[in-house]
């Protein structure tokens, strides 16, 4: 029987690449995204609950949850809109993952081999300038992942965290190519930005039934950037 997955943020970037790879392996995938065919606001608990119920009725119980939705934000602490940016960033990047896990939890436990993969960032492992809302949200997602691993591991559910580094997605496409190349030469040992499908490869590997002993792991997919240090 085919497994069923939900991928948040699955309409573009890393999320889209994850959807395509899961589907190529025969997994039935529902995309939760504000820009998807059926828009879902993952930062709203009621919207999440309704969408999960609809998915369950259409595809079956949920076996895999990939929380890939996220927004990149920043600004000075004393900025005029800092509080609003903070609240929105944590709502999308952290609280939404909690809503998703709660809505899917019964299915994941009942499956006996449920898989949760949270997509954070290398910002979860360090901090950059003027990115505190984003950095805090990703540190929080990493901590949430570890808590899930401890709380759910005994019920057959694994939770792991993938931390992409500089990747060619909508969050980085506005950066001039020359600036990207300069950054890559200086900070990334492999000398380039990553591709969404390279991150998706690791995400999907963690959803495999054979990955049942990988739990609470935090995996950087960053071309060696964190190993080198900034």
PLM region spans:
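Conserved mid-core segment of classical short-chain dehydrogenase/reductases
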Residues: 72-87, 110, 130-133, 173-174
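The beta1-alpha1 cofactor-binding region of Rossmann-like NAD(H)/NADP(H)-dependent oxidoreductases
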Residues: 40-50, 83, 197-198
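Short C-terminal tail/terminal secondary-structure segment
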Residues: 126, 215-230
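Short, small/polar-rich loop/turn modules that mediate ligand/substrate recognition or access, typified
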Residues: 153, 158, 214-216
């Amino acid at each position: 029987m085919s497994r069923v997955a939900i991928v948040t943020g699955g309409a573009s970037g890393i999320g889209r690449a994850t959807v395509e790879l899961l589907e190529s392996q025969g997994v039935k995938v529902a995309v939760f995204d504000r820009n998807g065919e059926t828009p879902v606001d993952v930062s709203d608990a009621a919207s999440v609950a309704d969408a999960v119920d609809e998915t369950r009725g259409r595809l079956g119980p949920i076996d895999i949850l990939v929380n890939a939705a996220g927004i990149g934000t920043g600004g000075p602490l004393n900025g005029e809109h800092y509080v609003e940016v903070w609240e929105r960033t944590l709502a999308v990047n952290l609280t939404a993952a909690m809503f998703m896990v709660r809505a899917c939890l019964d299915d994941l436990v009942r499956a006996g081999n449920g898989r949760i993969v949270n997509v954070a960032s290398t910002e979860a492992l360090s901090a950059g300038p003027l990115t505190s809302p984003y950095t805090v949200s990703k540190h929080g997602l990493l901590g949430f992942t570890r808590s899930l691993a401890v709380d759910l591991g005994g019920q057959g559910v694994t939770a792991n965290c993938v931390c992409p580094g500089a990747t060619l997605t909508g969050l980085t496409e506005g950066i001039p190519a020359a600036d990207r190349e300069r950054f890559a030469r200086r900070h990334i040992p492999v000398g380039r930005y990553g591709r969404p499908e390279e991150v998706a490869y690791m995400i999907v590997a963690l959803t495999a039934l054979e990955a049942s002993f990988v739990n609470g792991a935090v995996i950087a997919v960053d071309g060696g950037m964190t190993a080198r240090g900034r």
